[in-house]
Amino acid sequence: RLVEVVQHIVVRRTDCGTIRGISVNTRNGMMPEIILIQTLIGRVVAENIYIGSRCIVVRNQDIGIGLINRFITFQTQPIFIRTPFTCRNTSWICRLCYGRSPIHGDLVELGEAVGIIAGQSIGEPGTQLTLRTFHTGGVFTGGTAEYVRAPSNGKIKLNEDLVHPTRTRHGYPAFICNIDLYVTIESDDIIHNVIIPPKSFLLVQNDQYVKSEQVIAEIRAGTYTFNLKERVRKHIYSDSEGEMHWSTDVYHASEFMYSNVHILPKTSHLWILSGKSCRSNTIHFLLRKDQDQITMDSLSNGKTNISNLLERNDQVKHKLFRFNTFGTKEKGISDYSIFNEIICTDHSYPAIFHDTFYFLAKRRRNRFLIPFPFQSIQERKNERMSPSGVSIEIPINGIFHRNSIFAYFDDPQYRRHSSGITKYRTIGIHSIFQKEDFIEYRGIKELKPKSQIQVDRFFFIPEEVHILPKSSSLMVRNNSLVGIGTPITFNIRSRVGGLVRLDKKKKKIELKIFSGNIHFPGEMDKISRHSAILIPPGTVKKKKCNKSKKIKNWIYVQWIATTKKKYFVLVRPVILYEIPDSNNFVKLFPQDLFQEKDNLELKVVNYILYGNGKSIRGISDTRIQLVRTCLVFNWDDGKNSSSIEEAPASFIEVRTNGLIEYFLRIDLVKSNTSYIRKRNEPSGFGLIGDNKSDRINPFFSIHSKGKIQQSLSQNHGTIRMLLNRNKECRSWIILSSSNCFQMRPFNNEKSHNGIKKDPIISINNNGPLGIALQVANFYSLYHLITHNQISIIKNLQLDKLTEIFQVIKYYLMDENDKICKPDLYSNIILNPFHLNWFFLHHFYCEKTFTRISLGQFICENICIAQMKNRPHLKLKSGQVIIVQMDSVIIRSANPYLATPGATIHGHYGEILSQGDILVTFIYEKSRSGDITQGLPKVEQILEIRSIDSISMNLEKRIDAWNECITKIIGIPWGFLIGAELTIAQSRISLVNKIQKVYRSQGVHIHNRHIEIIVRQITSKVLVSEDGMSNIFLPGELIGLLRAERTGRALEEAICYRALLLGVTKTSLNTQSFISEASFQETARVLAKAALRGRIDWLKGLKENVVLGGMIPVGTGFKRIMHRSRSRQHNKITRKKKLFEVEIRNLLFHHRKLLDFANFKEFM
C-alpha cells in the first residue's frame, strides 16, 4: 500500500521556485541533538541564514554535517528548510525540495523514483521488526518507582487532617499529603515512625493493619523512569439508582454548549442520592406534582379500579385514626396530613384519579417566592432595608391576611425638615391595619394612626415649633414679630421670621412661629372670626373699595385675636403636594416573582401618615415623612378564594458559591386544625396542641404530649420532579422511607454501632432543595436545632424559654463556638444572625467531632459524637434531611471520589439509572515498547483511522477560529490561510507520530520518506458549498495545488475543506484509472472510468508496467525529457500568444503530459 500511493513520485525538475519552508529551531532544549541532526542532514535551505549581518548560508544550499555543527554552536535563529511539503509540483517533486540522495552525498538525480524508495524505507523496517518480535517473543520495556514499605506488622496512625483523597496515575484511590507526613506503625512491642515526603501518594488508611514490607506510600518527588506511557480512559459506573449531586468544586456550567460534560477542577465527591426513578407520560404528568405522596405498589400494578380505591381509602382512614393515646412520645404530623389531603384529592380530578392509581397525599403548590436585595448582615444588623429603600413588613405572628400591607417605600419628595399642619380631603379610609400588628425595623418607634387614609392631594402649612420647659426664660412675647435668627432663649434662635404664639401648659411651654403676611380687615370684610380657611389661587375682590387682588398660589388665612376687640388676619403660605396615581414604586420592588400561579395581586396605594388638621412636630434635625407608598398584598384562589384567609410567611436563604440571596416565601394554604378536631377538646386524637405551634416546620417533627406519630410504611413515597431537557418525556423520582435511615445518638438505649434502622420515618416535604423556616412561633426551640437559615428583622426574645429548658436540658452553641447556658429565671436573647445553632446535651455528650447540619453530606464511618462509656457513634453515607432533638434522619447516598481532570457525565440533579456512566478518569498506563503495539498505530495513522476520541465541539471550535482569522486579515484570505494552516499542522503531527514509533525501536528513518507518504494522503481537498464556483462542483475531490492555482488564475475564490485520506483511498483517487484498477476494485474502477470517459496519461510507473511501456524513470526519463524540451522550445519561439502562455501556466502538468503523449505516438 505504501508503494502504491507514491509509485508515480519521480524527480522531474531541479527547482520548482517555491519560497516556502518549514521552521526548525536549533536552540538548546528545543529538540534533541540526534533528532536535530537527522532532521537537517541532506536538506536544502529555503532562506539565507545570517549571524548578525554576516550571511553564512545562502538559499538553495544543501546542509551537511559541518553546517549543522555550526548551527548548534552559534545557536542561530530558526532555520527554514525545503521539504516535499513545500514543493509546488503536483504529481512529482523537484531536486531541491527533496535534498540529497540517500545513496550518495549529492543532490538527487533527475528521474529518480523517490516515491518507491520512500515506500520501501518505511515498510521494510516494520517487516523486520515484526519478524524479530515473532521470533524473540517481544521486548520488555518498563521502569522503577520509589516506594515506602512498612518495617513491621502493625496498625497505621496518622493525622487525617494533613491528607486529602485523590487517585494515583493508574486510577486507584489513595491519599496525598502536601507537607511532610509522620506515620506511626504501632505493633505489640515497638513503635516505628516513618516520614512521608510531600506530594507523595499514601496507599493506606488510618487505623489500617499492615504487614511487614507492605507498600504504604509512593514517593513522587523524583522523576519517573517510565518513558513509555499512554493515556487510558476509565469509566466509573453508578452502583445504584438515584439523583446526582455534587459540591461547588465542580463547574456547574458544561464544558461545551449543548453537552452534559462537566470538568472537575480539584478533588471532590460526587453523590448519588437514593430514590426510585420513574418515567411519566403526558397524562400522568398533569396529575403528579412535586412533593406529592404516592403508593409504591401503584407503580407496578398500574391502574386501580374504584372498589380497590375505596378499600384503600378506608385503610388509610383506619391508619389515620388508629393512634396511641396512652401518652407515648410520638412525632407530630406535618402540615400536609393524609386526612386533609385525601379530602382535597376527592374534590379534584375525581374521575381521572380513580382510573389511574392511588395518591396517598396531594401536595399543595400554591406559593410564591419574592426576592429582595438585603444588605450584608454585618453592615446592618438592626435594619432590614434594601438599597432601593423598599422595606418589607412582616406581621409578628408571621401570617398575612387579605389586603395586608406587604412593603412600603418612603418617597424623599414627601419629607419635610420643619413642623407644620396637614390639610386634605379624604378619598378612602382603611381601618384594618392596626399599629400593634407590625414590627418596627428601624430601631425607633414611630407614631402611626389607627387607620390608613388615602388621599389624592394635600396641603402643608409650615411653622416652627419649640417645646420648652416651663422654667425657661423667654426673650420674646406672645403675638410679637421676630426675624430670622432672633434669640428666643439663651441657646435657641428662630429659623424663620413671623408671628410668635405662646401656649403655656402645666409643665411646658409650646412656642410657635407663623410665617406670612399680616392683614387688618375692615369693618365690612366678612371673614368669620376664630376660623382658618384655605383660599385657592384667583382674584379676591373687596366690596368697600371695589378693589381686587390677584392670588397666584394657595394661601391659608388664619384669624388672630390679640384682645377681645383687636384682631387681625395672618395670611400664611401653603405647600401643595400632588399624589399621582402611578409612581415608580413598582420599579423599585423586584418584579421577578417566582410564583406557581397567577393569583398574586400587588396594588400600589399612597397613604398619608397624619390626620387632617393635625399639627406635626419635628424633633431636632429629623425629617418628617408625610406620605408613605405602600404595596397592598392580596391573592385570588379561584373558587376557594373565601376559604383561604391566611398566608403564612417564611424566609429562605440560598447560598451559592459564597453568594447569599434572600427570598420571602408565602404559602397560600389553609390550616388543617379546624376539621381534625375541636381546639379545646380534651380527648380525641390531639393532632395539634392547645397552646403549641399550629404551623409546623416541614423539616421537623415536634415531640410533645398529645402529638401523634405520622408513619410512612415501605410502600409509601414522596414524588420529586426532576429537571429534564426533554419536555415530552419528563421524569420524577420517588423518595420513600426505604431510602432513609435514622440514627439516635442521644437516646438511652444501648446499641453497638449507634445506628438504628427505623422504617417508620416521616419524610413529608423532605428534600435537599432548600431550608424554609416559618416566621411565626420562633420561641419554639425546635426551629433552632439545625443549620438555621433564619433571616428575621432584629433580635428575637424567647418568651417561653424557662418552660422549655425545664424539660429539655440542652446547651446552645452558636457558630462562633460560644456556649449559651440558659438561665431559668431570665429570658435569653438569641441572635438569629448567627445562623448555625447546635445543641449539646449536658449529660451524655462529652465531645463533638462532627457538626451535623441540614443538607450536609456525610461519608461512611464518620464519628459524630463520643459518649460516656459507649463506643463512638458513626453514620452511614448520605445526606442529612432531618435533624431532631434525639435523632438524625439521613437519606442514603453513595459517594464517588473524583480527581482533577475527570469529566462528569450528567447535569446537577439529573436522575441516573444503575449502570449509567457517572465519571470518566484519564490516567497513565505504562506500556511496553514492543513494535507489535507500535505498528498497528502506524497503520491507523496512515489509513486515517480514529485513535483517540474526538471532541464533540471540534467543528464549532474550527468555525470560531475561522471567524477570528477572517476578521483579522479579511474575507478573501480567511479560507486560504485557515485551510493552509490546518493542512500544514496536520502533516507535521502525522510525521511526528510515525517517527515516535520507529525511534522507540532504534530504527532511524529520514523524515523526507515519511513526508512523501503524508504529502500524498493530504494532497486532496473537498470543494465546499460555502461559495459559488463555476469551475468545480460541490463535493468534488481535487488537488490542493490545483485549487489554489485555479483560484489565482481566474481571480475567483474557491471554497474548499481540508481532507485526510488514507493510503488506500488515496491510491483509488489518482489520475490513472489503470493504476487504480490494478490495485483494488478492478471491475468498479474500470466501469466508472468508461462511463466518465476518463483518459489515462500514463505518467506513473505502474500503468506503464501494466501496459508494457517504458517507465518514466532513469534512462527512460532522460529520453522523454530531451524530446519534450526541444519541442517545448520550438513551440514557445514559434507562437508567442498571450492566451496560450496563460493556459500553459495554468495547466502546467498537463503540458508535460501532452508532450509525453506525443512522444508515445512518435514512438
From Swiss-Prot:
Q: Which organism is it from?
A: Pisum sativum
User: Which annotated residues bind Zn(2+)?
Assistant: 16, 87, 94, 97
Enumerate the Gene3D superfamilies for this protein. 1.10.150.390, 1.10.1790.20
Taxonomic lineage of this organism? Answer: Eukaryota, Viridiplantae, Streptophyta, Embryophyta, Tracheophyta
State the Gene Ontology BP annotations. Answer: DNA-templated transcription
Q: Which domain of life is it from?
A: Eukaryota
Molecular function terms in GO for this entry? Answer: DNA binding; DNA-directed RNA polymerase activity; metal ion binding
Q: What is this protein called?
A: DNA-directed RNA polymerase subunit beta''
* Cofactor notes: Binds 1 Zn(2+) ion per subunit.
Q: What class of enzyme is it?
A: transferase
Q: Which UniProt keywords are present, listed alphabetically?
A: Chloroplast, DNA-directed RNA polymerase, Metal-binding, Nucleotidyltransferase, Plastid, Transcription, Transferase, Zinc
Q: What does this protein do?
A: DNA-dependent RNA polymerase catalyzes the transcription of DNA into RNA using the four ribonucleoside triphosphates as substrates.
Q: Where in the cell is it found?
A: Plastid, Chloroplast
**Record-listed E.C. numbers:** 2.7.7.6
For activity, the cofactor(s) needed are:
Zn(2+)
Q: Which reactions is this enzyme annotated as catalysing?
A: RNA(n) + a ribonucleoside 5'-triphosphate = RNA(n+1) + diphosphate
GO cellular component annotations, sorted alphabetically?
chloroplast; DNA-directed RNA polymerase complex; mitochondrion
Indicate the family of this protein. Answer: Belongs to the RNA polymerase beta' chain family. RpoC2 subfamily.
- The protein's predominant localisation is plastid
Task: State whether it acts alone or in a complex, and with which partners, per the record.
Answer: In plastids the minimal PEP RNA polymerase catalytic core is composed of four subunits: alpha, beta, beta', and beta''. When a (nuclear-encoded) sigma factor is associated with the core the holoenzyme is formed, which can initiate transcription.
